[in-house]
């Protein structure tokens, strides 16, 4: 049992196979809790689907461990991945291409993504750059809770520090950050 609050980073660590990833997926509504409850802003979300969570105005973002399986669509460009995610927050319409380009450019600049353009295909990026695009896309949604599963796994030290800095910026903005890791 634990409580996470806005403006703080809560770390959950454990050995491989101890259930951290499942915890993330359950809180994000991607898996069902077997027991217990998940209370978000005073409301139980245990039985809600991700779509129901969005409909209730509950804003949380999930940065999964599997960057190209559950995170980004590898065959699509950076801009298309940014625009695709925006669809869930806009009633019935997608972000237009101009706005998508602006957001993608901001993510590329702020997170120092090494890419020739926002139209670059995601699967051609390095693992660290894919992680930066994924994190940038999620924080662009201005969540109340940002759930991250192993956000620095496999990244070089420079990329890891940048990710830590971005997570600390989110904390300073009042976002609750749930950081799942092994150490």
Model-derived features: positions:
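Glycine-rich phosphate-binding loops of nucleotide-dependent enzymes
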Residues: 1-183
């Amino acid at each position: 049992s634990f409580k996470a609050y806005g403006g703080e980073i809560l770390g959950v660590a454990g050995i491989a196979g101890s259930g951290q990833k499942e915890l993330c997926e359950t809180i994000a509504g991607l898996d069902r809790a077997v027991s217990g409850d998940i209370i978000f802003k005073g409301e139980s979300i245990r039985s809600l689907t991700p779509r129901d969570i969005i409909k209730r105005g509950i804003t949380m973002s999930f940065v999964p461990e599997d960057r190209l399986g559950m995170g980004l669509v590898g065959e699509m460009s950076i801009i298309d991945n940014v625009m695709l995610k925006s669809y869930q927050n806009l009633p019935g319409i997608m972000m237009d291409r101009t706005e998508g380009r602006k957001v993608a450019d901001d993510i590329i600049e702020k997170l120092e993504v090494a890419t020739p353009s926002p139209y670059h295909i995601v699967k051609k990026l390095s693992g660290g750059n894919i992680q930066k695009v994924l994190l940038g896309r999620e924080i662009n949604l201005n969540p109340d809770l940002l759930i991250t599963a192993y956000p620095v796994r496999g990244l070089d030290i420079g990329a890891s520090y940048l990710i830590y800095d971005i997570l600390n910026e989110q904390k300073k903005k009042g976002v609750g950050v749930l950081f799942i890791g092994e150490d």
